[in-house]
């Protein structure tokens, strides 16, 4: 039997506000335990929550970017459950009236483009965390994270593989960082993924029983967890047993999922409207303000890069993976007047160098103006492609040097003396009679061998195109 995997993702996006969703306490990461726990998070008697306006504004921006319906009336609900890191005994969330509904997000997997529907995105507060390390067998409670504003973004169960799930998570991660509503730091818990996974026979319309894998904080873990869980469910079904609905944990060391608890449903949490919070009504002025503050979105910018700079759609997608990358490209392409070559250098040599050094683009020793200068020297014939790679390496190692200084210091300027190049061509032709005869007999590969010999003789400084033209003219 052929099985189909069905996946829906619930992604917790931590909003990058300075204060918490219902109090003025700081959201800064890394403080001493409970340093940022206010009386609201500690649930002291008589305290009341006060809504953070910025949370609503950031949620609206995500809704606009997802081309979603934005509900003007927002009601908060209490999600009731007991856990030590939740002193109130309930989490403030949204059940029936989420701020964002019916959005969509485009993903790319290989050569395929697919649109995934986004069911909803709702505002809620984060819980605290239990601390087990360094307490001699005891468990401590850290409420610094409690009350941190979240948007829980829920997809439709339209993802059909781990690769699609990772592509969706990466697309949403790129979007929320692009909008500057989340810092996207997965190691610090700013972007956490829960994956709902089920399997069914290929062609069956009815969904199988799903199991939810909680708190996946890397794209690699997301892929591994889904693949393992799908195989585990298939094995259960092929053995004649039934999959039990459950909440799962992923063990990255063993690369496997395990049951944390049997899955609860919404009725188990006994949701009801929070009586301490009035409905939040989004005004026309707030909507207009959010629309005015929206940046050019990645898809729109990618289309513009194709139209204005002549780059391929594939390159445009890479260049718009982040706002920093897009800004770098546009600055360099405008300065050099060479869109496609700039894209090639960014997605090729520069990306490889950054990856090897473990650096972000912002820390690159080759800034956008320096890359533009390099590309410009290739365009005006000063550097051949081979010499340009040597110049790039020197620029990386010598961040204070200009391209002109590097070319002079390392003797990288392409030969412009036609007579000298012609003399080298004549000498190579005289010494490679066999290759000459092969070319005259119609063997085009022989031409490449002759060009290679001339380039070797010139120490890479001759212009390959010029050399090829001279050879063809002499052997015509």
Swiss-Prot record:
SUPFAM superfamilies: GatB/YqeY motif (SSF89095), Glutamine synthetase/guanido kinase (SSF55931). InterPro entries: Asn/Gln-tRNA_amidoTrfase_suB/E (IPR017959), Asn/Gln-tRNA_Trfase_suB/E_cat (IPR006075), Asn/Gln_amidotransferase (IPR018027), Asn/Gln_tRNA_amidoTrase-B-like (IPR003789), GatB (IPR004413), GatB_C_1 (IPR042114), GatB_Yqey_C_2 (IPR023168), Gln-tRNA_amidoTrfase_suB_CS (IPR017958). PROSITE patterns: GATB. It catalyses: L-glutamyl-tRNA(Gln) + L-glutamine + ATP + H2O = L-glutaminyl-tRNA(Gln) + L-glutamate + ADP + phosphate + H(+); L-aspartyl-tRNA(Asn) + L-glutamine + ATP + H2O = L-asparaginyl-tRNA(Asn) + L-glutamate + ADP + phosphate + 2 H(+). Coiled coil: none annotated. One of its GO terms (biological process) is glutaminyl-tRNAGln biosynthesis via transamidation. The keyword Ligase applies. The keyword Transferase does not apply. Its EC number is 6.3.5.-. Keywords: ATP-binding, Ligase, Nucleotide-binding, Protein biosynthesis. Disulfide bonds: none annotated. Pfam families: GatB_N, GatB_Yqey. It is an enzyme of class 6 (ligase). GO terms for molecular function: asparaginyl-tRNA synthase (glutamine-hydrolyzing) activity; ATP binding; glutaminyl-tRNA synthase (glutamine-hydrolyzing) activity. It comes from the Bacteria. HAMAP family: GatB. Allows the formation of correctly charged Asn-tRNA(Asn) or Gln-tRNA(Gln) through the transamidation of misacylated Asp-tRNA(Asn) or Glu-tRNA(Gln) in organisms which lack either or both of asparaginyl-tRNA or glutaminyl-tRNA synthetases. The reaction takes place in the presence of glutamine and ATP through an activated phospho-Asp-tRNA(Asn) or phospho-Glu-tRNA(Gln). Heterotrimer of A, B and C subunits. Belongs to the GatB/GatE family. GatB subfamily. This is Aspartyl/glutamyl-tRNA(Asn/Gln) amidotransferase subunit B.
